[in-house]
Amino acid sequence: MDKLRGARPLRLLLLLLALLPALRGQDLSMEECCDKGVEWANKNRICTSLPLISESRECSMTQVQCCRSKLEEHYCSDGIEFASVHEECDSHNGENSTCEAEYFKKCCYCCLLGKTAQVQGQSCEPNLKIGYQCGIVFRACCVKGQEGTDVSISDDAPKKEQVEISKEELDQEDPYLHDGCRGGGPCSQQCRDTGSSYVCSCFVGYQLQPDGVNCEDINECITGTHSCGIGQTCVNTLGSFRCQRDTSCGTGYELTDDSRCKDIDECETGTHNCPPDFICQNTPGSFRCRPKLQCMNGFIQDALGNCIDINECLSTNMPCPAGQICINTDGSYTCQRISPSCGRGYHLNEDGTRCVDVDECSSSDQPCGEGHVCINGPGNYRCECKSGYSFDVISRTCIDINECRRYPGRLCAHKCENTPGSYYCTCTMGFKLSSDGRSCEDLNECESSPCSQECANVYGSYQCYCRRGFQLSDIDGISCEDIDECALPTGGHICSFRCINIPGSFQCTCPSTGYRLAPNARNCQDIDECVAETHNCSFNETCFNIQGGFRCLSLECPENYRKSGDTVRLEKTDTIRCIKSCRPNDVNCVLDPVHTISHTVISLPTFREFTRPEEIIFLRAITPTYPANQADIIFDITEGNLRESFDIIKRYMDGMTVGVVRQVRPIVGPFHAILKLEMNYVMGGVVSHRNIVNVHIFVSEYWF
């Protein structure tokens, strides 16, 4: 029984089946299903697209298994024929599935072993542990070599002559006559006889299904048992997997069979474009054309293969020493000494190789007066006023310029202060000077932690705020005070049971017994003592979980009724059903219209707000096989409806008649009542049979 969450009611889905079963169509026989699978295998040589002829699970399994078994016979016959003709198996290149290649080579190898045993004069009865099917092929090929007959393991294998053996010979010669795995046995892949029974197993890459007979492919890509590396994608195949490279290899590389990138040797494959006078040299991902002709020292080969002179004088590393000039020659160069003469304002450098400017401004005797600045130029100099000064033609001196007065509002973003020869900018409170010395940028006051908790910087100021569960003090605007969430108008809805305020937050608690705090730390979650086995019910009692506790009830079937198997578990609620079971010749029991008597338990909360009827139980029944317009189902509450707190209405849902039990009045828990519900099947005004449901209703004192 599903528990209510919040203010939503619990809805019980109780399925009561009518005694008269619906008519079913006749299923196909197992032989017909198998014949269809064999026919498909002979015609298409594949079973993956096998069309199923019936919705029956048994028929589908039979059809698929017979198709696979027939394919295995085809593959095995092909392997035996290949071994008989070629005397080897490795040269066969199968283009079909891995499964075909597996059965082909298995029977081919086993046949070669039998032929070898016949040639060596050994017994045709295999004493190796090679498996049942391999043993049959081994013996057939060995006997074939002795008798000169063709080998066949299938009734319809093409171009094979059958070896007919009488029943007496079969009983004398075939040691596998009473083998449980004879003919492949019931197993889909591998079968091992244990004497009194058999054991099925699967090939590598497959796993045995729960039925112990069939095998299914293991998806190594999902189970993580593949060996694909980084940059590769695992692709599942039948019985195995393969690794596929995620990205292409790029120009100059090719993808190998093992999904690796291999360099393409363009020189070896002849895909290069080197001219006849060049030699192709392979490089990783490309190639290089190297000329056949080698040039002498002082020359270099051009794109056409011609040798041209190298101008050493244009090299970044000057080949000649200081004071000498480089002169290029054919295949070499020469160095020639320089003897310059300097004009006014220049002089020779220390090496005497070239003329350099004389810096008059760097001499101890300043050529310019006080307040001026000397500016050197090539071969001369000039005197100018320093930055921040202007030349006064009257006094012939440089005087300070008041930039703040001359360019008001254009130099500084906030405040301008004049200084001799310059000025500086300042900012108002809440700002600081930028790196350009003129602009003002916001000062992040939060870096000095002025607030007790959190600080938000704003343009030119800052704002204090508090973490969740606190509020800013109205006194100083800096300190944070705890918020009592439990005292807020919505505090009664924060926790489902009880709210306890703590600094900066709150805690929810639940009743001391029967409940635990839910993962959201707000709602209370019922503890199912029956599932946890923390109840104290005796062996003869049944534990029923209710909200906040449990009840031990001893529910027995009345006379002429028996329990229908084990107790039915429906969504955390036990339902006990008693079915009528009459003694022989008990006419009164047979005529009693009551067919089933059920007991179930439902737990409800005390609804905080009850504004409309709450649907709590659904009684569903399948209408009997007679026409619906000749039968009617009447639902009724016959006992336990205290204060008319419940009613039952009839509804039609999905072709079924449903009785909906509703709570129509508010009930304050704790409260316990037993509703006796009747579901009467009426035909022609007469009750044909009746089902009784006893619903034990427990109302919790809490709303959750």
From Swiss-Prot:
Q: Where is this region: Self-association and FN1-binding?
A: 357-441
| Occurrences of domain EGF-like (ranges) | 177-216, 217-262, 263-308, 309-356, 357-399, 400-441, 442-481, 482-525, 526-579
A Gene Ontology biological process in which this protein takes part is: extracellular matrix organization
Q: Give its localization.
A: Secreted, Extracellular space, Extracellular matrix
| Taxonomic superkingdom | Eukaryota
Query: What keywords is this UniProt entry annotated with?
Result: Calcium, Disulfide bond, EGF-like domain, Extracellular matrix, Glycoprotein, Repeat, Secreted, Signal
Family named by the database record: Belongs to the fibulin family.
Detail the disulphide connectivity of this chain as listed in its UniProt entry: C33-C59, C34-C66, C47-C67, C76-C107, C89-C108, C110-C134, C111-C141, C124-C142, C181-C191, C187-C200, C202-C215, C221-C234, C228-C243, C249-C261, C267-C280, C274-C289, C295-C307, C313-C326, C320-C335, C342-C355, C361-C374, C368-C383, C385-C398, C404-C416, C412-C425, C427-C440, C446-C455, C451-C464, C466-C480, C486-C499, C495-C508, C510-C524, C530-C543, C537-C552, C557-C578
Functionally, this protein is described as follows:
Incorporated into fibronectin-containing matrix fibers. May play a role in cell adhesion and migration along protein fibers within the extracellular matrix (ECM). Could be important for certain developmental processes and contribute to the supramolecular organization of ECM architecture, in particular to those of basement membranes.
Q: Which InterPro entries match?
A: Anaphylatoxin/fibulin (IPR000020), cEGF (IPR026823), EGF-like_Ca-bd_dom (IPR001881), EGF-like_dom (IPR000742), EGF-type_Asp/Asn_hydroxyl_site (IPR000152), EGF_Ca-bd_CS (IPR018097), Fibulin-1 (IPR017048), Fibulin_C (IPR055088)
Q: Which GO terms describe its molecular function?
A: calcium ion binding; peptidase activator activity
What are the boundaries of the signal sequence? 1-25
Q: Per the UniProt entry, what species is this protein from, by scientific name? A: Gallus gallus (Chicken)
Q: What is this protein called?
A: Fibulin-1
The coding gene here is FBLN1
Q: What is the lineage of its organism?
A: Eukaryota, Metazoa, Chordata, Craniata, Vertebrata
Q: Which GO terms describe its cellular component?
A: extracellular region
Give the matching Pfam families: ANATO (PF01821), cEGF (PF12662), EGF_CA (PF07645), Fibulin_C (PF22914)
